[in-house]
Amino acid sequence: MSNVLVLKSSISGNNSQTNQLVDYAVEKLQGNNIIVRDLSQQPLPYFDTVAAIAVRGEPKTIEEKQLLALSDELIEELKNAQTLIIGAPMYNLNIPTQLKSYFDFIARPSVTFQYTAKGPEGLLKGKKVIVLCAFGGLYDEENLVTQYMKSILGFIGITDVQFVYAQGIGFGPEAIEKAQASAKNKINEIVAAL
């Protein structure tokens, strides 16, 4: 049995094409220890100056200490997971702010990455990630969602990342059905190889 961390970030709930893919992947991974964190239904605090001080400095106030405890909890979940399922829909060419906040809280110097003479080095190695993306249009792999997810995951040491796309969902019901079927087939292939 494997530990699986699932991150949902779509604001569209059950109507979300990305969430439908995430739910499908979770169903295929039953029998594992699965933790689901819905960043839209249970949003993290906005990563502001207080949060930055809390996770990168010396927390002094009660609020700073609470934010550090939250960061520690998120990082512990991440460290314990062998596999991550991340729902990353495209909103205005980028990931949802809820997902960006998550990465702001878990990207911590000397905890999930360290600075070296050769540049930053990620400390969370050996994890597998499946990123599930629904796009209204058709995009190549140079899109900002894919590039950001590769970059931020690599920054913390995670390089075994596979992407599953449901593209063209903005073209109507037939396109949605086709995109979902194609994405689910890809999920089946990836899960079978885990």
UniProtKB/Swiss-Prot annotation:
Entry keyword Oxidoreductase: yes
Cofactor: FMN
Reaction catalyzed: 2 a quinone + NADH + H(+) = 2 a 1,4-benzosemiquinone + NAD(+); N,N-dimethyl-1,4-phenylenediamine + anthranilate + 2 NAD(+) = 2-(4-dimethylaminophenyl)diazenylbenzoate + 2 NADH + 2 H(+)
Coiled-coil portions: none
Superkingdom of origin organism: Bacteria
InterPro entries from the UniProt entry: Flavodoxin_fold, Flavoprotein-like_sf, FMN-dep_NADH:Q_OxRdtase_AzoR1, NADH:quinone_OxRdtase_FMN_depd
Residues noted as binding FMN in the record, renumbered to the chain: 10, 90-93
The enzyme's E.C. designation: 1.6.5.-, 1.7.1.17
Family statement drawn from the similarity comment of this UniProt entry: Belongs to the azoreductase type 1 family.
Known role: Quinone reductase that provides resistance to thiol-specific stress caused by electrophilic quinones.
Protein name: FMN-dependent NADH:quinone oxidoreductase
Annotated gene: azoR
